[in-house]
Amino acid sequence: MTSCSNCGTTLIGDFCQACGQKRFVESDRRFGHLLSQFAASATDLDGRFWRTIRALAFQPGLLSREYFDGRRARWISPVSLFLAVSVVYFIAPSLGGDLTLQFNQQVSGRLRQLALGPDETLSAQQLASSGQPYSALTAPWIEKRVHQRDEAARAASGGTSGYSYRDYRLAYDAKANDVSKALVILHVPIAALALLLMFAGQRRYYAEHFVFALHYLSFWMLSLQVVLQLSNLLNLLPAVLHPPDAAYDWLMRTLLPAYAVFAVRRAYSTGWPKALLGAFGLVAAIVLFNLFVYHAVQFVVTFALT
């Protein structure tokens, strides 16, 4: 009699009656077996991963509702889903509608002008801009860093070359997108807190609202990649048929709040008025967090890395 390689139980058939693992055979050691497993997983449209992705995209709020009600075996966990989508989001190109602020969006018009390239210009509005609410506080950081690096560069080159604000702008912009994507998870606890307050009457655990936030942010990242691919496809058309870049941004601005309404209504089993109010609170919390906290954190982290 053969024993299960996983738990040691004596096997009766091809699968262990105790733990469910398939009987181990010599061919399982070969590379072909590994490839066949990968192919099966990638093409199994009834598998948990693809089933979960379909539900996330086309049935707003269903995954959260199923989690609340304890029906979890058919779906991958909210954390696993978020991590999987995050990996795709992190490695994909950036597109308008994401959360990245480049150097010129983080600083005042004065520093923007100092960081201009030889063939670049700024509008009067851009020059007059005060930047972000915290830009006046962070401007001395940038000035000190550029000054120190300029002195070091001149000392090392005997005065033949230095370090400019434009040099720092390019270094900052090269890192900002990755930092922004890595920090997107910071929105989850804030969104969950907003939902906890909006639906306090349902007496749900904070962890349940956290799950909804994971699902919502997963959809946000996934939909952004779909819009990116749509943009790439439309760019294959003649230039006269290309939609303006702002169209993709407005598509996301419309899609995400609408999705939030349907998701809240299903997940929290509430009527349309409460769903609209809950979705408004969710989106407002994310927007306010972006304006007053997230962008500042993004700047500090990017500054520390550049």
Q: What do the PLM-derived regions correspond to, one by one?
A:
Residues 1-306:
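Membrane-proximal intrinsically disordered regions of secretory-pathway and membrane-system proteins
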